[in-house]
Amino acid sequence: MSKRIEVYFVPADGREPAEVLAAKAKRAYVATGFNERIAEGDFAALKVHFGESGNTGHVKPGWLAGLIGEIGQRTKHAFLTDSNTLYVGNRSNSIDHLRLAWSHGFTPEATGLPVIIADGLIGRDKREPRSAQARTSSSKIAAAILDADALVGLTHVTGHVQTGLGAAIKNVGMGCASRAGKLEQHSVTHPRID
């Protein structure tokens, strides 16, 4: 019999005030008990998608206040992170990516945390951990993700052309990959309609 996995769900509506959503996110996070696993001095990555230019369908910085406060009680080395995109645009290099994040309010002044683009200036900062248990023998992961001692994913739900739904698994699976890792993931799958 497979192990039962607990899912924590808090109903939320993007039209609710940021303080209400921050309290709800904190409540769900605290319920997981994950914060107790973060040690003083740990590097804690808060993996978010900073949105696209002109986009409003992403997690807002104000919604993170409760989580950031909880994590901040455990370590002073927390940071917001994402990796560069494979496609050309405002998130394909760290300079434009940071400017976009800042324009959406993900600034140290607003959140209390720095933003680190996990795969470096142009997406080449990567490592290739190997595993006999994984579907592939190695994966190309953004270096700062592997340097972190803890990873907390903060995800919005979207439609996705290949999977039908993009959410937590895509935020971590694709969002923690380097550009080479993203290319590898996209090159081995092809949409099929039955």
At which residue positions do the language-model features occur?
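N-terminal and secondary-structure boundary signal
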Residues: 1-194
